[in-house]
């Protein structure tokens, strides 16, 4: 059964957002991966703070970005498209994490789907 795997907080001003979440929730942040990307410690699950980006052309991400873990990304992608969803960002590999895609649902919400794989290259 697919389950929530990760959430990301998108921010225009990373230092300001970091201070807010440190003060509000006591979370700590560790630089990881590309510049401007921080893993959040203390959020209770995989979580990150990252610079705001466009997954759908011309529309910056607002709010929290959720990613669902699935056993087979290709099958899930086909099911999402058959249900009326659209690919927002094609499949990419995150080394040591897995294969990731982003989709737009029928209501315009953008979300990620990942097939976790610690051996991904």
Please state what every model-predicted region is:
Residues 1-19, 45-46, 64-68, 116-121:
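N-terminal beta-strand motif that seeds the catalytic metal site of vicinal oxygen chelate
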Residues 4-12, 55-81, 83-121:
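Vicinal oxygen chelate
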Residues 17-21, 80, 108:
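Conserved active-site tyrosine of GNAT-family acetyltransferases
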Residues 23, 37, 65, 100-101, ...:
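Residue-level detection of beta-strand scaffold positions
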Residues 23-29, 84-87:
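Conserved acetyl-CoA-binding loop of GNAT-fold acetyltransferases
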Residues 27-61, 110-116:
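Conserved short beta-strand elements that form part of the metal-binding/catalytic scaffold
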């Amino acid at each position: 059964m697919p389950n929530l795997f990760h959430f990301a907080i998108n921010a225009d001003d990373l230092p300001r957002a970091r201070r807010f979440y440190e003060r509000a929730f006591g979370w700590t942040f560790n630089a990881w991966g590309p510049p401007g990307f921080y893993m959040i410690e203390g959020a209770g699950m995989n979580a990150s703070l990252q610079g705001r980006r466009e997954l759908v052309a011309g529309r910056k991400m607002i709010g929290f970005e959720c990613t669902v873990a699935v056993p087979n990304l290709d099958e899930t992608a086909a099911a999402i498209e058959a249900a009326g969803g659209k690919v927002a960002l094609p499949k990419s590999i995150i080394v040591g994490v897995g294969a990731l895609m982003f989709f737009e649902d029928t209501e315009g919400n953008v979300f990620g789907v990942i097939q976790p794989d610690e051996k991904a290259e």
